[in-house]
């Protein structure tokens, strides 16, 4: 009996180790080309509006994919979906590396990578829930969370060094390391019984078309793209009201409190993602820093601080409540953006401090948004509601990156607002920082006031 227990425990630990590896490289995949965006723009002679699609393409299929994999996990089984995700992710990596000299091929590769990598966050938590004993699940979730935080922390430093001393194209090969998990996970995970069920393919296609064309509009400002996007969303809304098992529950749209929380949370997440994508351009243009310096000196301390801020945020939520922590997070974000607006041309290390507080504020916000949003849901709405929040969070990051890329390409924004003498290279970035601050303040105030007066029990 003890031998059987030891073997079972060993199997669970082995599963957890390989899940941690998948989680780590899933995070690296998200940010792998972020610090290299200026280099990519220079190599292809493209404006930020086009170059940022290197990240937007990944986040688009990644966000949609997380929702799709989650819904398919019962019908097709975790084992099959994980294998499919890993293979597709690696296939995208190979295409991107081999075809890195062709911009359209690079974008296509990032679409493919996102479609594969989406399996990792969507299914890792399901594997833990199904395979890890109840008494050890808390530790397992905590370990995976720590691995993700570590990936977010060391990622910019690693990719910055590789891009600077070798070439940014080699960053596309990093996700290939996940292929080593395949034989072990296939052996450790059980064969699952497939459950028949309906899958809303038409709904996914309509929503995806609407999202893609909206993002194209934000980077090109072509009205035709906006018209196609609006029409797709209108048909999508009509569709989900008719089908029995829609991709998105239309009943959630009637929950105004929930929708405000999801929308404002998404705006905050998207704004910060857009800012982070702007940092490499800003540091190159204003302070002439190298890719290695941007990754390891400017961004690295901020990403590492997320671990500390996440821990502090959790303690404050228990002691003072989520709205108190949300207020602090919004204050960190808005004040940081406003301070950077005035002092952007000072020494480059100043931006390191700004990023620490920006990502700290984001950590606080991400800690509490799920808590306050879930309070507006009925018990039977919880699963669909939290899935929609998760989907919106990922999607908003891709949308934010696309929008900021478009804004960086608008000459009208490259105007002087401050009366004092500032370097011309700071005009565009300072104006956007002021815009970011305003967006954060409005979104934060709306969320806090709406939920404060809702009398919800957090």
UniProtKB/Swiss-Prot annotation:
It comes from the Bacteria. The keyword Transport applies. InterPro entries: MFS (IPR011701), MFS_dom (IPR020846), MFS_trans_sf (IPR036259). Belongs to the major facilitator superfamily. TCR/Tet family. This is Tetracycline resistance protein. Resistance to tetracycline by an active tetracycline efflux. This is an energy-dependent process that decreases the accumulation of the antibiotic in whole cells. This protein functions as a metal-tetracycline/H(+) antiporter. The chain crosses the membrane at residues 12-33, 81-100, 111-129, 140-162, 165-185, 201-221, 223-240, 256-276, 297-317, 324-344, 346-365, 432-451. It comes from Streptococcus agalactiae. The keyword Kinase does not apply. It is found in: Cell membrane. Pfam families: MFS_1.
């Amino acid at each position: 009996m003890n031998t059987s227990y030891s073997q079972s425990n060993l199997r669970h630990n082995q599963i957890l180790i390989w899940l941690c590896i998948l989680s780590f490289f899933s995070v690296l995949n998200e940010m792998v080309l972020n610090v290299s965006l200026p280099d990519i723009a220079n190599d292809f002679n493209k404006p930020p509006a086009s170059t940022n699609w290197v990240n937007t393409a990944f986040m688009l299929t990644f966000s949609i994919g997380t929702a799709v994999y989650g819904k398919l996990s019962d019908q097709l089984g975790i084992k099959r979906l994980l294998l499919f995700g890993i293979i597709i992710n690696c296939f995208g990596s190979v295409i991107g590396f081999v075809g890195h000299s062709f911009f359209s091929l690079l974008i296509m590769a990032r679409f493919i990578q996102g479609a594969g990598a989406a399996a990792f966050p969507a299914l890792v938590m399901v594997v833990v829930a199904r395979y890890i004993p109840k008494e050890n699940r808390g530790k397992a979730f905590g370990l995976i969370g720590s691995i993700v935080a570590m990936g977010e922390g060391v990622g910019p430093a690693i990719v910055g060094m590789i891009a600077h001393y070798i070439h940014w194209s080699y960053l596309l090969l990093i996700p290939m390391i996940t292929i080593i998990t395949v034989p072990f996970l296939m052996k450790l995970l059980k064969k699952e019984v497939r459950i028949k069920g309906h899958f809303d393919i038409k709904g996914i296609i309509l929503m995806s078309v609407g999202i893609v064309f909206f993002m194209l509009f934000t980077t090109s400002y072509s009205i035709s793209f906006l018209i196609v996007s609006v029409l797709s969303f209108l048909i999508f809304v009509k569709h989900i009201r008719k089908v029995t098992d829609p991709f998105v529950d239309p009943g959630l749209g009637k929950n105004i409190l929930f929708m405000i929380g999801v929308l404002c949370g998404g705006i905050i997440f998207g704004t910060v993602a857009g800012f982070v994508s702007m940092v490499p351009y800003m540091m190159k243009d204003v302070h002439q820093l190298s890719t290695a310096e941007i990754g390891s000196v400017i961004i690295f301390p901020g990403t590492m601080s997320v671990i500390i801020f996440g821990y502090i945020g959790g303690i404050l939520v228990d002691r003072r409540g989520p709205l108190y922590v949300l207020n602090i997070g919004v204050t960190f974000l808005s004040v940081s953006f406003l301070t950077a607006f005035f002092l952007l041309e000072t020494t480059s290390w100043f931006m390191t401090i700004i990023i620490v507080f920006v990502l700290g504020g984001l950590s606080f916000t991400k800690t509490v948004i799920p808590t306050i949003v879930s309070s507006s849901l009925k018990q039977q709405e919880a699963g669909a509601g939290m899935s929609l929040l998760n989907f919106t969070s990922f999607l908003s990051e891709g949308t934010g990156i696309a929008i900021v890329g478009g804004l960086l390409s608008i000459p009208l924004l490259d105007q002087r607002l401050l009366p004092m003498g500032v370097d011309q290279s700071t005009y565009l970035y300072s104006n956007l920082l002021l815009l970011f601050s305003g967006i954060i303040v409005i979104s934060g105030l709306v969320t806090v006031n709406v939920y404060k007066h809702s009398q919800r029990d957090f």
